[in-house]
């Protein structure tokens, strides 16, 4: 049984960057397409197919509207990982006879970095841009990295680990002036912050359903039509999705993504106010009660549903065990199985000791003030206890610089 505490259900979900709970309105919209409206949207000879096709196209227009795109520019995929692979590898394969250079950032999602490493093995040159200590890229460094061989720049809008928001409008302007395609993994920002593909000069954008209170297993890739962007498909078959992504479309999941996008479009301002208020309440109350807690990533240029905090003198893994009533993460869900410190935190210059103490707290649409207050109280009480047991904390209080210690190897 799930324990109850003063009408509070435990454990409290605070891992909104890993996934979001499905909005009940999304589930309600999806259900008929599992049961009575089960037609194949590619069946053109009867009403079951027409009904499913209409639902798919309505969802497509909802997704497009949220980023200021044309309906025909939305290609449905299985999620942001596939979309990122399709965008990066698809551009590389189509244009490799003309250009052979791609630029990305050291702090991108693992699937972007891995797609780029795969292309390196095929002879494509990849530049991995560094980021500043606040997590933001330097625009001059980007400008200087672009050559006449550069075909694509790939920069995510909101970092999944530290929540910083990259200056997409400025990046897009540079790319357009230099005649380079601009791809952005917008999975963590879609439906949460305003994104306009035309104002930002974005040519390709990757979208995920389960990051915006929609179902898992569905995503989309925005592919610009004017000026036209061409990509080589990764999956061959029946030629669905304008030939870019073959396979029968999963109508229920697409309807869910569409409804999630529609809700985000109408409620983004309300969600933002709610999340910002809880972010400030969480962070201010933590800082009032315990010392040497650091917010990773820029405080202002960030999506405030993400609080990545380092607690000096406390191991992140032991902290997670101590606060088991909170569902949190010590890294991205894709890489946190590793005990290595986060590559994103290392890329902003955080030392190994502090990187190991980092925990990511996620705040979302369904997080309550009561949950935040409970989380703060629990964290503060456990931090005090863990620090009292920690020889590292004791050494820090005595002014010993842990970086200068030479540890014995056994």
Curated annotation (Swiss-Prot):
Main localization category: cytoplasm
Enzyme class per UniProt: transferase
EC number: 2.8.1.7
Gene Ontology terms describing biological process: [2Fe-2S] cluster assembly
The entry's keywords: 2Fe-2S, Cytoplasm, Iron, Iron-sulfur, Metal-binding, Pyridoxal phosphate, Transferase
A GO term from the CC aspect: L-cysteine desulfurase complex
Binding site for [2Fe-2S] cluster: 334
Record-linked InterPro entries: Aminotrans_V_dom (IPR000192), Aminotrans_V_PyrdxlP_BS (IPR020578), Cys_deSase_IscS (IPR010240), Cysteine_dSase (IPR016454), PyrdxlP-dep_Trfase (IPR015424), PyrdxlP-dep_Trfase_major (IPR015421), PyrdxlP-dep_Trfase_small (IPR015422)
Active site, per annotation: 334 (cysteine persulfide intermediate)
Pfam families: Aminotran_5
Residue numbers of N6-(pyridoxal phosphate)lysine PTMs: 211
Reactions that this protein is recorded to catalyse: (sulfur carrier)-H + L-cysteine = (sulfur carrier)-SH + L-alanine
Cofactors demanded by this protein: pyridoxal 5'-phosphate
Protein localization: Cytoplasm
MF-aspect GO terms: 2 iron, 2 sulfur cluster binding; cysteine desulfurase activity; metal ion binding; pyridoxal phosphate binding
Known pathway: Cofactor biosynthesis; iron-sulfur cluster biosynthesis
Membership in a protein family: Belongs to the class-V pyridoxal-phosphate-dependent aminotransferase family. NifS/IscS subfamily.
Protein's job: Master enzyme that delivers sulfur to a number of partners involved in Fe-S cluster assembly, tRNA modification or cofactor biosynthesis. Catalyzes the removal of elemental sulfur atoms from cysteine to produce alanine. Functions as a sulfur delivery protein for Fe-S cluster synthesis onto IscU, an Fe-S scaffold assembly protein, as well as other S acceptor proteins.
Name used for this protein in its record: Cysteine desulfurase IscS
UniProt lineage: Bacteria, Pseudomonadati, Pseudomonadota, Alphaproteobacteria, Rickettsiales
Record gene name: iscS
